């Protein structure tokens, strides 16, 4: 329902997508973006061809919601190919295949590395002005998108792949551009709050573990006397709760 819980809804016309807000559009991804394939490794060049060595992204670099830059490789390509396969800021990176949980996962390229290329198993989706890259990246992480990628993928033993044509045929629910931005901001705010609460909970657990270890250490080294210790009652009630005839 977007940000308005009372918004009018309509049937999206897509069984696995269900209803969407009435003012949203639902259309194939190709209406809002183009797809750029990547380069294939292992190509050799004649001595008279100008080449350059540049970094490139593999499937392992494209994680769910972020780019892992810890293991970026380089590749030698012709200067013409370098221009063709060079990533642009705002491209949405999506994996062609792998394990089912990796299928179609994506994130926005923010220009983290200059003149970076991408492998042929990594799609670069280039949205037009009607589609926010962040909105598309969020959609790829949704249950609806994962269902589509699974249904339209080619399955083999423990592996799956989705073609660029099936990818670009994916029905995309898209609100007006302003609402895309507002929804993204709201999701980021909520995600940050969840991260904060998670950190607080993890710190509390870590502190309790440390105190437990310290207590055990003190007990086994004779620093505290636990011979008369009794566990607290699992059920305690104020005196006012004890009525006549109740067990004492």
Where in the sequence are the language-model features?
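Sequence-specific dsDNA recognition surfaces
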Residues: 13, 30-46, 60-92, 235, ...
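Amphipathic alpha-helical coiled-coil/heptad-repeat segments
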Residues: 1-5, 173-248
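A short glycine-rich beta-alpha junction/loop motif
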Residues: 115-123, 154-182
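Short, conserved charged micro-motifs
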Residues: 131-135, 178-181
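Short, ligand-facing micro-motifs at secondary-structure edges
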Residues: 63-74, 92-118, 134-138, 147-152
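Non-catalytic DNA-recognition/assembly elements of restriction-modification systems
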Residues: 8-41, 169, 173-181, 185-196, ...
């Amino acid at each position: 329902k977007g940000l308005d819980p009372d918004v009018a809804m309509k049937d999206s016309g897509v069984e696995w997508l269900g209803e969407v807000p009435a003012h949203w559009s639902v259309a194939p991804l190709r209406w809002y973006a183009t797809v750029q394939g990547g380069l294939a490794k292992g190509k050799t060049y004649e001595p008279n061809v100008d080449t350059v060595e540049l970094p490139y992204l593999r499937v392992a670099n494209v994680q769910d919601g972020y780019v892992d830059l810890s293991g970026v490789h380089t590749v030698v390509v012709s200067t013409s190919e370098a221009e063709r396969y060079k990533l642009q800021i705002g491209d949405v990176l999506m994996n062609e295949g792998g394990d089912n949980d990796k299928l179609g996962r994506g994130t926005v390229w923010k220009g983290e590395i200059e003149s970076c290329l991408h492998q042929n198993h990594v799609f670069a989706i280039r949205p037009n002005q009607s589609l926010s890259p962040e909105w598309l990246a969020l959609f790829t992480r949704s249950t609806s998108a994962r269902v589509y990628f699974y249904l339209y993928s080619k399955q083999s033993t423990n592996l799956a792949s989705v073609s660029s044509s099936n990818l670009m045929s994916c029905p995309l629910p898209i609100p007006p551009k302003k609402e895309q931005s507002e929804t993204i901001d709201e999701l980021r705010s909520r995600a940050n709050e969840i991260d904060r609460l998670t950190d607080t909970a993890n710190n509390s657990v870590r502190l309790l573990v440390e105190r437990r270890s310290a207590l055990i250490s003190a007990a086994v080294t004779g620093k505290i006397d636990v011979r008369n210790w009794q566990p607290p009652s699992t059920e305690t009630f104020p005196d006012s709760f004890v009525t006549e005839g109740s067990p004492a």
